[in-house]
A protein has these predicted regions:
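N-terminal subdomain of nucleotide-sugar transferases
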Residues: 1-54
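Nucleotide-sugar-dependent glycosyltransferase catalytic domains
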Residues: 29, 40-181
Length: 181
């Protein structure tokens, strides 16, 4: 029987990558070969936890996140401006990231994707015959208390609960639209 390989793909801040290290260690303890594909800036973090590292891209995500451009984008109150801004930050790295995802998924039977790797990762999984699994450590269920993780929170004012629930439904529609293209 061929060796079961699971590729975890996670990009973003360390807080977005760290839960996948924990997941990888659990899968590894269950006897599964695990690869964690992420930005090269997390290579030592991944390997010091005993996981196989694969580079998605040579992107210093911490530097991008701390840039004045990123701070200005994150300060916006307009969800569409936020999405456009985030895409403008990642667009220059997209082809390199997609190539890295394809390499990391080679021979894998499952690709577990975080929200920031779902767009290219889903297609890479399908191309290579790996089952794509979406894994979210942020709340993705519509709720009154929190908005979608992909939009800025609204200040505490009347109507905030409606806004919070609506952001989740809008993101579900956008994700559905993306996968039907």
């Amino acid at each position: 029987m061929p060796e079961k390989i699971v590729t975890l793909m996670a990009t973003g801040s360390r807080g977005q990558v760290q839960p996948y290290v924990a997941l990888g260690k659990g899968l590894q303890a269950a006897g599964i070969r695990v690869r964690l594909a992420t930005a090269s800036s997390y290579a030592s973090f991944v390997t010091e936890h005993g996981l196989e590292f694969h580079k998605i891209a040579d992107v210093d995500t911490q530097s991008i996140a701390q840039s004045d451009e990123a701070k200005a984008i994150m300060a916006t109150k307009d969800p569409l401006t936020l999405l456009r801004g985030v895409f403008s930050l990642i667009r220059p790295h997209f082809q390199e990231s997609l190539d890295g995802m394809l390499t990391a998924l080679d021979g894998a039977s499952v690709g577990i994707l975080n929200p920031l790797t779902q767009y290219g990762g889903y297609d890479a999984c399908k191309k290579l015959g790996a089952k794509p699994v979406f894994s979210y450590v942020q709340s993705m269920i519509p709720m009154k208390k929190l908005p979608s993780a992909f939009v800025p929170p609204m200040p505490a004012i009347p109507g905030q609960a409606v806004y919070n629930r609506l952001t989740h439904h809008i993101m579900l529609l956008l994700r559905s639209y993306n996968h039907n293209m």
